[in-house]
């Protein structure tokens, strides 16, 4: 299992998965950026938008792309981030209208949560409904290994 760790986040990836944990660059000295995690069961392109621009159009039906996007401290305590702990996904959470950028055949899932005092959005794009049971199991296995430090 390949390990990733940066910016207070750590996780293990199964064989065949790729991932990056990074922070966007800032243009203003006082600006603070937060962690963005990209994970996939296929090769990730170097150029990626936060929520999958540059990635999802090239996905095949068995592919899955996962984003963990950290929001700032102003989001803590808001109703949107009330869910506590790293979530698990279910097939029922996925739909074509839950995509940031709808593409034929793809399904999306989005869940906001707080883990260890840090607010996140989990965004998952599945390549197709046909592979959804396997995709859900793989994503949950990866999320089970996620360690969020305060």
Residue ranges and their predicted role:
Residues 8-24, 142-148:
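Short conserved aromatic/hydrophobic patches within beta-strands of well-structured domains
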Residues 130-150:
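Short flexible/disordered coil segments
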Residues 18-137:
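Conserved polar/disulfide-associated segments of primarily extracytoplasmic proteins
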Residues 1-12, 135:
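Short aromatic-glycine motifs in intrinsically disordered, low-complexity regions
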């Amino acid at each position: 299992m390949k390990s990733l760790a940066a910016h207070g986040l750590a996780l293990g990836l199964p064989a065949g998965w790729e991932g990056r944990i990074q922070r966007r660059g800032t243009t203003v000295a006082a600006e603070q950026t937060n962690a963005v995690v990209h994970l996939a069961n296929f090769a990730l392109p170097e150029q990626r938008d936060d929520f999958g621009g540059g990635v999802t159009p090239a996905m095949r039906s068995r592919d899955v792309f996962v984003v963990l996007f950290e929001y700032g401290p102003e989001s803590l305590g808001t109703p949107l981030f009330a869910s506590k702990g790293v979530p698990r996904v279910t097939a029922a959470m996925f739909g074509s209208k839950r995509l940031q950028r709808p593409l034929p055949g793809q399904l999306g899932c989005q869940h906001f949560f707080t883990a260890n005092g840090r607010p996140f959005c989990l965004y998952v794009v599945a390549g197709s409904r046909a592979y959804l049971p396997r995709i859900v199991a793989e994503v949950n296995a990866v999320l089970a290994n996620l360690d969020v430090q305060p």
